[in-house]
Amino acid sequence: MEKILFINASEYDSGNTSRLGHENLNGIDYDQLNLVDYKIFQLGQHFDDDQFEEVISKMKIADTWVICTPVYWHNMSGRLKVWLDRMSEYPHSMWYGKKLVLGVQGMEPSDTIGPMRHLMKRFCDLNQMEFLGEATTNRKIKGLNHGLKKLD
């Protein structure tokens, strides 16, 4: 049985982005990680109270990550960007074989989804992960949900 981790990159733990993740994972057993609940400092900053290792420990035990972000100024949230930057501190081989789904939520994410899809596919390629797809609409969510249920 696959272990699925929903990574919510919104400032709200139960807002529209969280709902997108919940719809994508409807009927599937998963854990939720809200990036807003952790102190994650910028790449290059070193503080004793940084909690990125706690995030990493949850990610290590998951087989599939469902990452959802709101669109702010035609791009991913700052939390997701910091998460991506910090991921570069870890060996790519740590994530070998894991799977990733991207959820993008916003009023009009169409101009954002292409560059974000490219970025996440590149991230998956570098880390030897499998990119399962992205969702911005209910129809797309239903298709990804069906695929995730096969993993569960």
Task: Locate the predicted segments by residue.
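Serine-hydrolase catalytic core
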Residues: 93
